[in-house]
Amino acid sequence: MTPVGPAVRGEAPVTLREIRVAFFRNLNLGQARSHSPTSSQLLDAFVEAGARAPSHVGTNGTVVYYHSTGPTLVRRVAKLLTPMCGYHDMVTVRSGSALIELHRRLRGLRDGEVILYDTTPGFDPPTPIESDDGLIVISLDHRRAITQHRLGSRPTAAGPFIASLVGVPTTTRSITTMRRVADRVREYAGA
């Protein structure tokens, strides 16, 4: 058994910064054609990598867990998943505090999408940006974009549009899903 630190063992207090959320791209639990793990394979990989109390929110590769460091653990998880089921795609991680702040930013918005990625700090183009078919990017920085769409329009998917703007792979969740993720983070924090 690999030794783990005190925060992972539950011997230290947990803060919002120790609550992490991993967002996997193109991971749909139990879907073999997308080389996705089952629920138990995914959660077991998190535990084996050193996370404490992982749980997924829905079936789209969103996992909330306790760990004192950020992306290091999810890189280990991704390496464990590759031989297990063939999954090999982008994953990004955010702290619990970042998710609570994002939830505040989503207040009052109708359903749209949140697109997550990692680029160089300082990337902060002016918004709003509107596509020809009615997709409106209302917020965009080096780690995430928030989109809506013009009423009555049927815009293309936000993920590819944002990926073309930021130049890196992205993963997308609906605003409704992100609200559920923030609720799970609050549960983990005991708030």
Residue ranges of each PLM-predicted region?
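Surface-exposed, charge/polar-rich loops and edge strands
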Residues: P13-N60, V64-A191
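N-terminal amphipathic/basic-hydrophobic helices that include classical n-h-c signal peptides
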Residues: M1-T15
